């Protein structure tokens, strides 16, 4: 007795949702260490500044705005950008909470920037604080600090921006 079962693919609802267009910033100090901060809403979870691109806004404008909004200063200059969008999916429970179910995750253009200010200019007590603590770390170590669902994106950032750590360019 044989039963023919048609082939089908199980698709999670989130697989059909779009990615939210965003930017991320790898902010390097003069010692070629990168800025990371611990999230207010996820204790123990560290990340670099990132955020959405507003309608009509250029990605590099969004990067400078996000820097100012999240760390209180935009005293930086762009030195590089990822060639392609880097994407990650949010876990379903976070996607519903963070994006009200409109997006499956984020697609990000990442900018490497050189911080031109003093550490004292960094202020996490912004209008809508996202971070509780910050530090400068070696680029390679950021993958150990980030939440697991962002790890692949951060590994790509390390690979694409590693030339900065290995050179004296833009010091």
Regions picked out by a protein language model, each given a short descriptive name:
Residues 1-12:
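N-terminal amphipathic/basic-hydrophobic helices that include classical n-h-c signal peptides
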Residues 143-171:
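Charged phosphate-binding loop/patch that engages nucleotide di/tri-phosphates or the phosphate backbone
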Residues 84-121, 135:
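Active-site-adjacent beta-strand/loop module that shapes the phosphate/pyrophosphate-binding cleft
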Residues 32-76:
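Conserved Nudix-box catalytic region and its N-terminal flanking loop in Nudix hydrolases
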Residues 121-126, 146-148:
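Short, charged, solvent-exposed linker or helix-capping segments at domain edges/interfaces
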Residues 14-34, 52-55:
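Conserved N-terminal beta-strand and adjoining loop/helix that marks the start
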């Amino acid at each position: 007795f044989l039963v023919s079962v048609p082939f089908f693919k199980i698709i999670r609802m989130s697989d059909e949702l779009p990615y939210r267009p965003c930017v991320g910033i790898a902010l390097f100090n003069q010692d070629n260490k990168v800025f990371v901060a611990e999230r207010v809403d996820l204790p123990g979870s560290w990340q670099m500044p990132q955020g959405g691109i507003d309608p009509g806004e250029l990605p590099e404008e969004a990067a400078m705005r996000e820097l100012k909004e999240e760390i209180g200063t935009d005293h930086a200059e762009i030195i590089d950008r990822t060639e392609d969008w880097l994407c990650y999916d949010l876990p379903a429970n976070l996607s519903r909470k963070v994006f009200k179910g409109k997006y499956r995750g984020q697609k990000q253009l990442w900018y490497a920037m050189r911080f031109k200010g003093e550490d004292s200019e960094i202020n996490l007590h912004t209008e809508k604080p996202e971070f509780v603590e910050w530090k400068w770390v070696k680029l390679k170590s950021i993958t150990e600090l980030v939440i697991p669902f962002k790890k692949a994106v951060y590994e790509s950032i390390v690979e694409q921006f590693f030339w900065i750590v290995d050179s004296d360019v833009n010091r």
